[in-house]
């Protein structure tokens, strides 16, 4: 057997060697070819996302080999700060490679490893990199749906990678054993694949570890040696595992194997229990009773900060919900929690509200909470009952157009019209005042000129009249 790790030895050298992922290839290869033709695509970066061990990085490396591209790779640990990206990635992305390379590809691996708070400036630097690049940028992520990664998603071509089918993974592992001259049972390979949840990279590592230690791979050896790896479940996988759990330990593992925070986990389950159990009133009642119990426990934890109650929260949400059913129900159409969807829709409106509260708090020397509670509702009421007066207030308070729109709601167009009229009338008044000042200046010049000459009583009299007019204009 080879001393080289099998994941390196049997890594795909060509695009066609990458197992499955045909849809991903159909999207990514034409995108790369556009770069090589000298006409960069509209999306200057590609974001490859999917479960671990399905071939995201392998496909990128195969593309580099096949198209003779120089690969500049950075891991999440290499671009924690803005300076890290500016020092390496931006410099590489804006320059051409030396021969014999035909081009250069920038690979940012595991961008979902960036912390929304800890990695200051990294996301902004990646966006700057995408804007400036003269070479294709490819990023990989297991879960790209974090809110801090939204700007990157919007600027990238999203390429999804599916889990590798069990039959194709089995065929590949058996082929490795054949090339290495290792006896291998099909049942053992199936067991390894199931333990690793379709992660081909982890399956190859386990296969090699057993083969090197015992010279063969059997089901008895695999079941005795391999420990199931903990894997983070997506919300959809968590629901699938929860609603179809047979035992309480399976249900508890489902709700504790996701990286959702406690509030969001509760919302996901509370939203989808009625959808899953809705065809049976008794199961629905028992399921929602478990959800209600979890809500009470979590409320008690929040009030008293007694986190020793957390296991009871998980027991209510996990086994409590899963074992509420008296039969297995057909899979329902699960959905995102309505509260999360609503918050996403109103994100911009809440941002304007917070800016308005900060602006008015500064003007009125009040707290933001007082402004939100007392002043904003009053302004909204004025906008509805007296749009003309509200327009004057808006100008006086120097409110921006989004703030006016937030306060005026349905009367926005009418208020906007009044604001424009007030602005134009103020402009006219300002012009009239400017003209009056110019007249005053001219009269003052005439007066000074007449005083200097001092010829005759008539001129003095005229000067006095001019002075009187000057005083009257100033008074006006």
Swiss-Prot record:
Describe its function. Part of the RFC clamp loader complex which loads the PCNA sliding clamp onto DNA.
HAMAP family reported in the protein's UniProt record: RfcL (MF_01508)
Q: Which CDD domains match?
A: AAA, HLD_clamp_RFC
Q: Which InterPro entries match?
A: AAA+_ATPase, ATPase_AAA_core, DNA_replication_fac_RFC1_C, P-loop_NTPase, Rep_factor-C_lsu, RFC_lid
* Domain of life (superkingdom): Archaea
Asked if the record carries the keyword Nucleotide-binding, the reply is yes
What is this protein identified as? Answer: Replication factor C large subunit
Task: Cite a single GO MF annotation.
Answer: DNA clamp loader activity
**Protein's GO biological process:** DNA replication
- SMART domains per record: AAA
Which species is this record about?
Ignicoccus hospitalis (strain KIN4/I / DSM 18386 / JCM 14125)
Stretches for region Disordered: 447-476
Give the similarity note.
Answer: Belongs to the activator 1 small subunits family. RfcL subfamily.
Q: Where is the composition biased (Basic residues)?
A: 452-461
Q: Where does ATP bind?
A: 50-57
A single GO cellular-component term from the record reads: DNA replication factor C complex
Q: Describe the subunit structure.
A: Heteromultimer composed of small subunits (RfcS) and large subunits (RfcL).
Going by the UniProt record, its keywords in alphabetical order are:
ATP-binding, DNA replication, Nucleotide-binding
